[in-house]
Structures are given as structure tokens and as C-alpha cells.
């Protein structure tokens, strides 16, 4: 049973779906305890089973109630292993696992800040089980340094990409055309298209890109179109701030907020370059790997897990985070490189992604970790 706050959108959520599918294909049953979200339909279509409860809550009384619900579920369904993917639900999941003597695993999907002893204790819940899974070597090194964990208790399993879904040969032109029309891009628009995919939240670096675009416009560059694909998930103030910043810079024709996208393979094919301008380190950065699987060049912040997934000058470029001038320079370089050279870089990224970041390899490693824990507990 996996426990995740929500199944809306994001790397942890996609990995939850991937692992649930792998468990089912291996002959097991896959439960996911979560508040819910738009990806529940995919879970259930794969044969996974939803256990809906407010595991996203940080209210201690709600967390205790969740633990009780999880205990009942573990006993009723004879759950053999509990896997938490976030801190707040990890407390409920850990208590339930301890009460039922069920093996407990936690995945570090992010690098959590710890500016006090209390916060460090809160974060440490992820390390209190049988095994910690880190989603990159960067994350593994952070956990070891932060918590002094026995290295034998932590394993790095890089996130994987579904290469059946993210395969440029399997996306018909009708899908990219439908997206082009939905996003209001003219059929004869020949500008270089940049895509920043991800929920509208400050750490994703949208404001850096808006300022970079303003600098490019000031340098008389008008041969680009930037698309922000993602919804605000209730952060309406930030969405309004982005809209105002675009208008203030006179970039309404060059920067568009297009909302949530369900067809990311088509979105990457529709565009020329993917952007990942995060202002804080991504522990892995699936948004840097998926476009490479689709043969697209990536420009990413030079920190965190993207240092592992993007090869500077070969599959894309690494740029100082939060530096609009550096981002303007990198984006201008990508435009001037030309389509043929960008595609050659994209082919390098696609080849590397297929070698290192396959979802089947990630799932096999995760199920292998489960098996070792169950054997050790037997």
C-alpha cells in the first residue's frame, strides 16, 4: 500500500501510479491511500484500489484518525508492506505499520528544509522505517548528511519515464494539432517555442523566465513563444501575479499561460525547448527527463537532481537559477542554434534517457527493494 497526499499531478504522484501498475502486473494488489485527485482514474483503470482519506492533513487529530483507518485497512486486506511518499502521511502510515508489525518504506521525493530541531524531527519520520528510497543521488547524499542514516538503509532509485507514453514515434500529428489549436497558436507561427511545464508555484521560476523574456524583447528578439503549462491548484494570487508581470512587460503575445495539460508527450513535441528554471533544487526533476525522452533540448537550473539528468552542452544547458540575464542568454543561444542542431542535441538526450531513466527499470528496482525487506522480515 502506498500513501501519498494527493493524486493530482507531479513526480511523486506519477511514480505512485507507475509502481501500483508494476505491483499489479507482478500479480499483487495495489492500494493507494490518498485524498484523491485527477489521477485516481488512471490508478483504477490499471486495477489499483483507492483508499480515500485525508492523509494530506497535518492536524494531529486527523493524522491519528488516518492511522486508525490504515490499521483497519492493513488488517482487513492483509497488506504486506506500507510505502509512504510524503511526511505528513508518513506519520499515520508509520504508526499503522508499527501497530500491525508491517514493513515500512518511505521515499524522499524532495529535499526538505530543516532550520530547527523540530523541523528536523518532523522530516526524520521518512527515515524511521525499514528502508529509505531516494529519487536521485543528490537526494541520497542530502539524507545521509542531514540524518546520519546508516548507508545500508538508503538506496537511490532514479525516477523513470514511461517510454511507451513518452515516445515521439507514437504521438500522431492530430494530437499536437489539437493542442496547438487549444493553446491558440497560429498554424503559420514559426517562432521558437519554449515550454515550462509544472504547477504554477513560485519555486518553478516563472518570474525568472518572464524577466528573461523582457530582456530578450529589449534586445529586439521577437522570434520566441513561451508557454506555461500548469494550473495554480488554488494559488490564485500567484497566477494573477504572473499575468500582471506578463502585461507589465508587454509580453502578452510572447508569454502565454495555457493551463493544465493532460497530453504532455504532445506538448513536448509541439515545442522546441523545455525549460526547468526552478529557484530551489529539484530532488530529481522529471520535467527535465520527460522532454528528453521526446527528443527535446532542455534548459535547466544548475542545481539539484537536474545536474544528473541534463548534460550541459550535450543534451541541453545548465543555467544559474534565478538569473534572468543568464536565462535570456541561454534561450537566445537555443534559438540561434537552429532546429537541426537542437534536434541533434535532443537525440542525445533521448538516447541517454532510454539508457538511464526507464520506468520499467525504476519499478523493477522498487519491487526488488520490497522483496528484500519482506524476506528480511520473514
Predicted ranges, named:
Residues 10-18, 192, 196-215, 226, ...:
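A conserved mid-protein helix/loop that constitutes part of the nucleotide-sugar donor-binding site
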Residues 312-313, 317-325, 332-339:
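Conserved acidic donor-binding segment of nucleotide-sugar-dependent glycosyltransferases
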Residues 98, 104-134:
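A conserved, positively charged/aromatic
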Residues 234-241, 251-261, 267, 317-318:
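Active-site donor-binding acidic/aromatic loop of nucleotide-activated sugar
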Residues 33-38, 161, 197, 225-240:
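Glycosyltransferase donor-sugar binding loop
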Residues 32, 297-300, 310:
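Short hydrophobic beta-strand element within catalytic cores of glycosyltransferases
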Residues 84-90, 108:
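Short His-centered aromatic/hydrophobic patch
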Residues 333, 340-356, 365-368:
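A short, well-ordered alpha-helix in the C-terminal region of glycosyltransferases
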Amino acid at each position: 500500500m502506498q500513501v501519498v497526499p494527493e493524486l493530482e499531478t507531479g513526480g511523486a504522484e506519477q511514480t505512485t501510479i507507475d509502481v501500483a501498475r508494476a505491483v499489479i502486473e507482478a500479480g499483487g494488489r495495489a492500494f493507494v491511500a490518498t485524498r484523491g485527485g485527477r489521477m485516481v482514474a488512471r490508478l483504477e483503470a490499471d486495477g489499483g484500489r483507492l483508499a480515500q482519506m485525508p492523509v494530506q492533513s497535518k492536524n494531529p487529530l486527523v493524522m491519528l484518525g488516518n492511522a486508525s483507518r490504515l490499521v483497519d485497512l492493513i488488517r482487513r486486506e492483509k497488506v504486506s508492506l506500507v510505502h509512504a511518499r510524503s511526511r505528513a502521511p508518513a506519520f499515520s502510515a508509520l504508526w499503522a505499520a508499527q501497530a500491525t508489525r508491517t514493513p515500512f518504506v518511505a521515499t524522499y521525493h524532495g529535499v526538505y528544509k530543516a532550520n530547527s530541531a523540530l523541523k528536523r524531527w518532523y522530516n526524520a519520520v521518512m527515515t524511521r522505517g525499514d528502508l529509505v528510497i531516494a529519487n536521485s543521488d543528490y537526494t541520497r547524499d542530502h539524507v545521509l548528511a542531514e540524518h546520519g542514516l546508516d548507508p545500508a538503509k538508503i538506496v537511490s532509485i532514479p525516477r523513470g519515464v514511461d517510454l511507451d507514453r513518452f515516445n515521439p514515434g507514437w504521438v500522431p500529428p492530430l494530437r499536437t494539432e489539437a493542442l496547438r489549436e487549444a493553446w491558440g497558436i497560429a498554424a503559420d507561427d514559426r517562432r521558437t517555442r519554449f515550454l515550462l511545464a509544472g504547477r504554477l508555484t513560485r519555486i518553478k521560476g516563472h518570474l525568472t523566465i518572464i524577466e528573461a523574456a523582457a530582456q530578450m524583447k529589449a534586445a529586439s528578439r521577437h522570434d520566441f513563444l513561451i508557454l506555461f503549462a500548469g494550473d495554480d491548484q488554488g494559488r490564485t494570487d500567484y497566477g494573477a501575479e504572473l499575468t500582471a508581470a506578463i502585461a507589465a512587460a508587454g509580453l502578452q503575445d510572447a508569454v502565454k499561460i495555457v493551463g493544465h495539460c493532460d497530453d504532455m508527450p504532445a506538448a513536448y513535441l509541439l515545442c522546441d525547448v523545455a525549460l526547468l528554471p526552478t529557484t530551489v533544487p529539484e530532488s530529481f526533476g522529471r520535467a527535465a527527463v520527460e522532454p528528453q525522452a521526446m527528443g527535446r533540448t532542455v534548459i535547466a537550473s544548475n542545481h539539484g537532481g537536474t545536474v544528473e539528468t541534463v548534460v550541459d552542452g550535450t543534451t541541453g544547458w545548465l543555467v544559474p537559477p534565478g538569473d534572468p540575464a543568464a536565462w535570456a542568454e541561454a534561450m537566445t543561444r537555443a534559438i540561434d542554434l537552429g532546429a537541426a542542431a537542437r534536434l541533434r542535441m535532443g537525440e542525445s538526450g533521448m538516447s541517454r534517457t532510454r539508457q538511464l531513466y526507464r520506468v520499467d527499470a525504476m519499478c523493477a528496482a522498487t519491487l526488488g527493494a520490497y522483496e528484500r525487506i519482506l524476506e528480511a522480515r520473514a
